[in-house]
């Protein structure tokens, strides 16, 4: 009798699994200031860790279909952008049905959908190349998109700052220029994977004009987030005793402000995806 052959999954299945894994890894990462993690719900009374897991898992079909769409079109083009937009809206409906209407991963659908698609087009590309190509794809119009007066749009008008859309269109600078390099530096310095990922999150928080923070607590809250994240990194990161003290202080400040760096969390998931997908 021949030994059973291992089942070979498709590239689209693999990329969807990597993206969902990145979302779950981001949710599980602890202690994250102001965010849902294994300790608490952070500044989110309407969310929990099991809800974040369920939301991430609900996006697997949508992300797989995005990868398949990219393979079908075979290139970065406007029809692919339109297809991703439609699939993303369908994924958002599935997410909201799973969470009872709670917006857990809307920004992550956008970021990871783009990255899954460009990785499906060229799975051997490195992280920098994938981010640049995702930016090109994000710049294309989605003719079926209905303008929505979202929190992010209101923040953009009020404070003149870009959100998730602009980060993607620029090629994810907070991830490529800050999150991924910090992840690699912390690993090289001997930090555990958890601490390296926390440091990557902090590096993103330190530079991102996070619309989630601006919506909840305005520019002063954003300054608290950015300065607090820099303070942790200045003490050697989350792996050091001094860094952990700064991290606890930052968490308390954010809970007091009811501020949550949700945009940075979405970009950390993108960072973790690129960290793995960029080495396929």
Swiss-Prot record:
GO terms for biological process: prosthetic group biosynthetic process. One of its GO terms (molecular function) is ATP binding. Gene3D superfamilies: Triphosphoribosyl-dephospho-CoA protein. Coiled coil: none annotated. Keywords: ATP-binding, Nucleotide-binding, Transferase. Its EC number is 2.4.2.52. It catalyses: 3'-dephospho-CoA + ATP = 2'-(5''-triphospho-alpha-D-ribosyl)-3'-dephospho-CoA + adenine. Belongs to the CitG/MdcB family. NCBIfam families: malonate_mdcB (TIGR03132), PRK01237.1 (NF002315). Involved in the formation of 2-(5''-phosphoribosyl)-3'-dephosphocoenzyme-A, the prosthetic group of the acyl-carrier protein of the malonate decarboxylase. This is Probable 2-(5''-triphosphoribosyl)-3'-dephosphocoenzyme-A synthase.
């Amino acid at each position: 009798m021949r030994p059973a052959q291992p089942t070979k999954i498709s590239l689209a299945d693999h990329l969807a699994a990597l993206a969902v894994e990145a979302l779950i890894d981001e949710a599980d990462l602890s202690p994250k200031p102001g965010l849902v993690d294994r300790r608490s719900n952070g500044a989110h009374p309407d969310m929990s860790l099991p809800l974040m897991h369920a939301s991430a898992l609900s996006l697997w079909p949508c992300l797989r279909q995005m990868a398949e769409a990219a393979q079908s079109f075979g290139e970065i083009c406007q029809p692919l952008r339109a297809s991703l937009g439609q699939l993303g809206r369908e994924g958002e409906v599935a997410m909201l049905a799973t969470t009872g209407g709670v917006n857990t991963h809307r920004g992550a659908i956008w970021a990871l959908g783009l990255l899954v698609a460009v990785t499906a087009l060229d799975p051997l590309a490195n992280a920098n190349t994938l981010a640049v190509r995702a930016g090109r794809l994000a710049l294309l119009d989605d003719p079926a998109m209905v303008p929505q007066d979202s929190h992010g749009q209101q923040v953009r008008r009020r404070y003149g700052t870009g959100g998730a859309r602009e980060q993607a269109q620029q090629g994810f600078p907070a991830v490529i220029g800050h999150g991924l390099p910090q992840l690699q530096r912390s690993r090289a310095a001997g930090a555990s994977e958890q601490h390296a990922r926390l440091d990557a999150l902090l590096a993103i928080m330190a530079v991102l004009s996070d619309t989630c923070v601006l919506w909840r607590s305005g520019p002063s809250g954003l300054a608290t987030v950015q300065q607090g994240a820099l303070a942790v990194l200045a003490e050697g990161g989350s792996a050091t005793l001094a860094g952990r003290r700064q991290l606890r202080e930052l968490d308390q400040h954010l809970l007091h402000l009811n501020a949550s760096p949700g945009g940075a969390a979405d970009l950390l998931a993108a960072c973790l995806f690129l960290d793995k997908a960029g080495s396929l």
